[in-house]
Curated annotation (Swiss-Prot):
PANTHER family, sorted: M CELL-TYPE AGGLUTINATION PROTEIN MAM3-RELATED (PTHR31492:SF14)
Subcellular location: Cell surface
Gene that encodes the chain: pfl3
CC terms in the record's Gene Ontology section: external side of cell wall
UniProt-listed GO biological process terms: flocculation
Protein name: Putative cell agglutination protein pfl3
Amino acid sequence: MSLFPQILLRLLFLAFTLKSTSNAEKHDKVDYKDFVRRDDGDTCLRYTTIYSQGEYETTITIPPNSYSNGVSLSNGTLLSTSSPLISTSGQFTSNNVSTTSSQRHNTKTITFFSGTSDYTSVYYDTTGTDDVVYEYHPSSERHKSTNDTWSTNLPTNPTTTAIYSTSGSSNITTPYSNRITNSNTSVNDITSKYLSVGTITLTTISGSDLYTSTFPANGTTSGTVEVVIPTAGTVTETAVSGSELYTSTFPANGTTSGTVEVVIPTAGTRTVTKISGSKFFTTTTDASGTVSGTVEVVLPTAGTNTMTVVSGSRFFTSVVSASGTVSGEQVIVYPTAGMVTETIVSGSEIFNTTYPASGTRTGTVEVVIPTAGTVTETEISGSELYTSTFPANGTTSGTVEVVIPTAGTRTVTKISGSKFFTTTTDASGTVSGTVEVVLPTAGTNTMTVVSGSRFFTSVVSASGTVSGEHIIVEPTAGVVTETVVSGSVGYTTTYPAHDTVSGTVEVVEPTAGVVTETVVSGSVGYTTAYPAHDTVSGTVEVVEPTAGVVTETVVSGSVGYTTTYPAHDTVSGTVEVVEPTAGVVTETVVSGSVGYTTTYPAHDTVSGTVEVVEPTAGVVTETVVSGSVGYTTTYPAHDTVSGTVEVVEPTAGVVTETVVSGSVGYTTTYPAHDTVSGTVEVVEPTAGVVTETVVSGSVGYTTTYPAHDTVSGTVEVVEPTAGVVTETVVSGSVGYTTTYPAHDTVSGTVEVVEPTAGVVTETVVSGSVGYTTTYPVQGTVSGTVMIVEPTAGYVTVTTSLGSSSYATTVATASGTSTGTVLQVVPSLFPGCNSKCTSSNAFRILVENDSISPSYLTYRESDGFGIASSNPSPAGSEGIFYYDSTLKRVVTCCDERPYYRTMEGDLAKTYFFIEDEGDGTYKFKLTYGAFSEYLDVKILADSTFFFKAMDSSSSTILNQKVRASNVYFKAVPL
């Protein structure tokens, strides 16, 4: 059942509340009793009484070793006996017994006297049978004082207590479960189900308002769960996943095992829920001075790690020394400290706001992979063999830092009828999370390449060299990506944080040193050696595709991520190679069906230039495939300009590489140093545009919108234009289409814009009702176009009622200046109506009626108010609302509904709602002057039903009753 009908049903049933006619009156309190161990070691017998308006507890403290009958409590165990009741007649002085009573919330107070007193504990019957009063037998709950000698009789059964009914003798299960499980259970293991130590939970129902608060007691700290995995020692782990093999060895000497620390529940949280009429208010705030729970994980622990990975023809081996190294660390804060979440439901509107508390920060995740040490890597790709060794001395391990969720995000969701609106904004002054990785650091590189008959060996000295550096920001530094899925609706927003800079990729391969080359072709062998003295080493600097650009592809399971983005203030990439003499080097390698042709310029040479650069600088493209869900996002980095395409062919300063592996071919062209890229007249897509496509089952989402501060391309046709987000959702028979612009964007100046920037178009089809809404986003300006379809700033709603369709167009957007077309749908309400509106009115469906479908319907033909039948004509069902003054459901003309129960809708036999005059109502079945009350039950899902009486109750059952076990349900218009 959706939220809107539930709210209306609550209103309906508040008006139809029944007062039971049972013989016994309910009492307004419930008593509980259990044993607890106090911090000072005393064993306490605690009595807790909960009233309908609050609660309080009274504790009798029984010190250890106080019993004279030889049964001791000093070991923390309970008395052992097989009898139904423990009769502890042991004597101990009143000086050893203390009685305390504390009032919790506007309640009565129990006092245990030192004289003679009898106590009776009253319980509610929870078995669902007749309402009967139960009480303890006097001998099971009596405390007397004679000459300072106390006698205590306590029940021992862990789940039941010998209690007796006023109407007979029977054992009844008490409505609480926190009993001692057996006679040998330590009281240290007992935790009261009610009023847990250090935590106060208060629930109050006053009228239609429900208040729930949970907060820690003064000076207490929430509970913790601590796990250590694995324990200290030597651990050898081998994992095979697909073609990947992982082996890790951790020495025990001096190492520390990983820890897992959980705090549940989070300390210092207060939650208040209020229900007032149809409004629900929920607020969660942190208590003053408290800190939220933390989860800490250390994986793996410090030590020596050996990892071998086989992926296709590639082998990776890494050895990390434990000496002086620090293990990777992962720190998670869940939930985020200092966060306030507020949910308000007012009528059909839902408001959700999440924002950080004053002075708090969001949680962080930190990972160090791999840790500092020695890394040896061997890679075989086809006929190529690569081996690299990196010493640990002076190296620094990589770091990964993530902040989830992004600090300071506010999300508001509004539901109006079948329409969903979601807005997400960032809080002022917050910064999004970053991911930073450093891969293999400075060291000595040895590379041997075998391609056909050619062997290449390069040795690079580590002395004075600079390590290759790989820095990744995922998502791009300062970029916030948020995805919200509500039902079948998915919302994704990507926007950059203020003044952030994107990441870079830089690789340095074989630097200054000695190069030895041996070529064997047939019986001819060639050997060339290049001395390092006074030579300038060949450098290869690759930014793929262009300099200052980061392209990252990650495949995890069925999930693939591809990201391309530029570094701050960088120029397109360069490839520079010196081999073996200055000038131009041309190299051709044929291996099997693979042909490689490379032309390298010598030092200080300048390559040719061309007119196309592909892909363009400053663009981030991300593709994620998870199951049947595909996500594609393209957006520019901060302060970048839209794209150019540059292609380099065999002219000077150009490197062209072609690799064929199986049926897969790869071709890459790199420009040389100091070249300038060409420009073109068309940019597709235009700069600053994000396009996202998501397919999940039968649900399809398409969204296009620009990044912050970007300007759309000026093109002949833009579909859709820059700054526009288009979303299409199909779920069953429901279709949603929404078009809206990103924050502060301006639409392109084009010949046709469909739809124009700054416009949101939403179409919802539910059953026979279709809704179409078009409206602008606040602060946006529509495009300058020849055709705008539909017109900006208008809401169009189409409603089908039976065979009739109505369309309404209303200008609702603030500040819009487009033409006005106003068509008013004929009113759903009768002419006498003065109370019903589209937001508060509903129909009442009768389920389980032998006439189906059945509604409470006005029947003017027989002049008898409201009767139940198939509506004729279609759409003639009665419309109702809740009158808060009358405190009941009435028609729009203030008529009080009837419901006929007999076959054929006999005018003389009907049911109606009778006002008892004390704020309660009864369902009454009438046949002429004869009347009976129906048996009415309210169900857990907030619907209710009533059933026909048996034949002994009424003569009216001589006719066929059709109202047996029927349900009423409110249905929104």
